Regions:
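ATP-dependent carboxylate-amine ligase catalytic core
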Residues: 18, 22, 26-37, 63-152, ...
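Hydrophobic alpha-helical scaffolding
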Residues: 18, 194, 249-252, 265
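A generic structural signal for residues located within well-ordered alpha-helices
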Residues: 20, 52, 116-119, 180, ...
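Acidic, Mg2+-coordinating active-site environments of NTP-dependent enzymes
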Residues: 39, 110-111, 118, 131-138, ...
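Short glycine/threonine-rich catalytic loop with a Thr-x-Gly-x-Asp
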Residues: 68, 247-260
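Thr-Gly-centered strand-to-loop micro-motif
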Residues: 85, 193-195, 246-247
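A short glycine/serine-rich beta->alpha loop
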Residues: 107-112, 244-250
Length: 273
């Protein structure tokens, strides 16, 4: 199978893009021997800032010496960007081999997987084969019924900024959308929250209380911008000083606070960061 053939197969119209629900992806992964159970995860949802936050968390883990997978969507230039280990994109050869591997399983289950489910299965198999210590995994859409939510309880469930998006599927208010995204919080994990208005935060507080999952709200008040230029920003946050961020905008400082809060949570869970 060539790269063009692999991508054509993945992107076929019959894969139907993205359809909420876990039945197809769970059946596919079960047939594959459940590669999603062979890695630890940081699961990231939200409307805005997911990609930046995922990249920051993955960078922190990588610098700490962990073999770190990163699963994101969509891509900017090449499909390979969506699946990475330690900052290196999946190779064309691996895409071909893994697509050929997953294809018979995908065609054997009760209903063909969607495109996103197919890519998710390829990503999980790739991370499992390479024995990643931890994978930073970005939700495709929503949370509770997103294909990525088949993973076991993550080390941290991270909720980025909530906005009105995919309202036809997730709901027409911020609170309803928050409810869908809160579905990635599971018993046994810690939750990290981008600060929101009280009615939205209450949705996550209720979910965490029901599941006995600790909730950690990122501290935006401790952010202090020291300087900025075309090369990025330098800032203080809590006890950390002169941190450099190669991204511009106040919203990126907020995303950085979420990433740093996540790192602190992982540290408390035994990760050496």
């Amino acid at each position: 199978m060539t790269l063009d053939e692999a991508l054509r197969y993945i992107h076929e119209v019959c894969w139907k893009g993205t359809i909420p629900g876990l039945e197809r992806i769970q059946a596919l992964l079960d047939a594959m021997g459940n590669p999603e159970r062979k890695c630890k995860f940081v699961h990231v949802t939200g409307t805005n800032g997911k990609g930046s936050t995922c990249a920051m968390v993955a960078s922190i883990l990588r610098k700490a010496g962990y073999k770190t997978g990163l699963y994101t969507s969509p891509y900017l230039i090449r499909f390979n960007e969506r699946i990475q280990i330690n900052g290196e994109h999946i190779s064309d050869a691996d895409i071909c081999e893994l697509t050929e591997y997953v294809k018979p399983f995908a065609e054997s289950i009760f209903e063909r997987p969607t495109e996103f489910e197919m890519v998710t299965a390829i990503g999980f198999e790739y991370f499992a084969r390479h024995k990643c210590d931890i994978v930073v995994c970005e939700v495709g859409m929503g949370g509770e019924f997103d294909a990525t939510n088949v993973i076991p309880a993550p080390e941290a469930a991270v909720i980025c900024n909530i906005g009105l998006d995919h309202t036809e599927v997730l709901g027409d208010t911020l609170e309803k959308i928050a409810g869908a995204k809160a579905g990635i919080i599971k018993p046994g994990c810690d939750a990290v929250l981008y600060r929101e208005r009280p009615s939205v935060e209450a949705v996550f507080e209720e979910r965490c209380k029901a599941l006995n999952a600790p909730l950690h709200k990122a501290d935006f008040d401790s952010l202090h911008l020291l300087s900025h230029s075309l090369e990025g920003q330098v800032f203080d946050w809590e006890r950390f000083h002169a941190l450099r961020l190669p991204l511009l905008g106040e919203h990126q400082l907020h995303n950085a606070a979420v990433a740093l809060t996540t790192a602190r949570v992982l540290q408390k869970r035994g990760w050496k960061i």
